[in-house]
From Swiss-Prot:
Signal peptide: none
Name the record gives this protein: Ubiquitin-like modifier-activating enzyme 5
SUPFAM superfamilies in alphabetical order: Activating enzymes of the ubiquitin-like proteins
Ranges for region Linker: 346-376
Motif (UFC1-binding sequence (UFC)): 388-403
This protein's domain notes: The UFC1-binding sequence (UFC) motif mediates interaction with UFC1.
Binding site for Zn(2+): 224, 227, 301, 306
Alphabetized InterPro entries for the sequence: D-isomer_DH_CS1, ThiF/MoeB/HesA, ThiF_NAD_FAD-bd, Ubiquitin-activating_enz
Amino acid sequence: MADSVERLRQRVEELEQELARERTRRSGGDGHCGRTRIQEMSDEVLDSNPYSRLMALKRMGIVSDYKKIRTYAVAIVGVGGVGSVTAEMLTRCGIGKLLLFDYDKVELANMNRLFFQPYQAGLSKVHAAEHTLRNINPDVLFEVHNYNITTVEHFEHFMNRISNGGLEEGQPVDLVLSCVDNFEARMAINTACNELGQTWMESGVSENAVSGHIQLMIPGESACFACAPPLVVASNIDEKTLKREGVCAASLPTTMGVVAGILVQNVLKFLLKFGTVSFYLGYNAMQDFFPTMFMKPNPQCDDKNCRKQQEEYKKRAAALPTQEAEPQEEAEVVHEDNEWGIELVSEVSEEELKNSSGPVPTLPEGITVAYTVPKKTEDSASEVTVEDSGESLEDLMARMKNM
C-alpha cells in the first residue's frame, strides 16, 4: 500500500512538471534558457557577460574574490513572498547551489507578492520556482523538495539533505535560510540546525505587513530560536487555533522585497566575508527604523542540543591562544627648547600680564582660586570735559557750512 502511494505521488509530481512546461509554452516561453552555461565567471565588461557588474565588486575593493560565490550551497525553506525573492536574488548573484523546500502550491492570492506569475497557479511552488530560476541563470544547480519538513518522515530527510546536500554530495550546505510563515516550521529548522551545528538565518514579516526582521543564528555562539521564543511558542499554543475563518494576514510586496533584500545582503556578507554581518536586524516601515542587536544564547534553553552547542563553543573559545595586550608607547613630551633655536614668545608683555591679574587672597591650605580680579584702572578719558561755548545749534551749523 505504501509503495503504491509513493508511486502515485511521484506520478503526480511528474504530471505537475509536465503541466508547468505546457503552461510555459502557451504563455510564450519555450521552456529553454536564453544562454548556455558559463564555466567560469569573468570580469570582462561586455553586454553579453551577466557577471560583469558582480565582478566589479572585487575591482572596487568590496570583495576579495567574488568567484567564491559559486562554491557555496544554500538551503531555502519556504518559497513564498520572502523565500521566492530570496531565491531569485541568490540565483542572479550566481550562487553555486540552491536547495528549495516547500509543500504549498502557487495560488492567485500570491500574485500581490513578487516572483510568481498567474499561469503558474496550481503548480507546486518549488517546481514553479525552479523552472523560472533555471531560465534566469542556468549556471546554478537546483534541488527541490515538495514536502512539509515538520512531519516526522520528512524531517529526517530534511536533516539528511542539509547535512549531505552541499555542492559536493556528502558535504553539508553552507547556510540554511528560514523564510517560513509559521512558528512550527521555525522550531523544526531550529531543532535540526542545533543538532547538526548548522549555521542558519531566520526571517519574518509581521501580520500587518509593515515590519520584518532577519536573524543570524550560530549554534552555541548566538541565541537560537528557542532561547528567547515568542509568546505563542513559549505558551505551547497551537497556531492553527488562532486563525479565524475569513481573516488573513496582510501582505505588501514592498515589505517582502525589503526583508528579502536585507536577508540576501547579510548572506553575501557572511559567505564572502565583507562588511559587518548583522546578528539581528529589524525593519519598521512606519518610522523607517532599522534596529540591530546581538542576542546571547540562553544557558537554560529548552533545547538540549543548544545547551550542548554552547558548551562546545566555550571549549573551543578556551582552547584559542590568548592574545596579550601590546604595551602602548607613551608619547614623548616636546619641550620648548629645540635644536633649531626656535623660541615661543608671548604677545602679552610682562607688565600687561602683571596688570591683568590681581592680588591672591590668603586662603587655607588646599584651596586655590581659579582666577584673580585685576586692579581697577582709572580711565583718564572719562575725566575729560568739554566747556559750553554758548553758541546755538544754528550758529554751529552755519560755521560748519563755511568750513
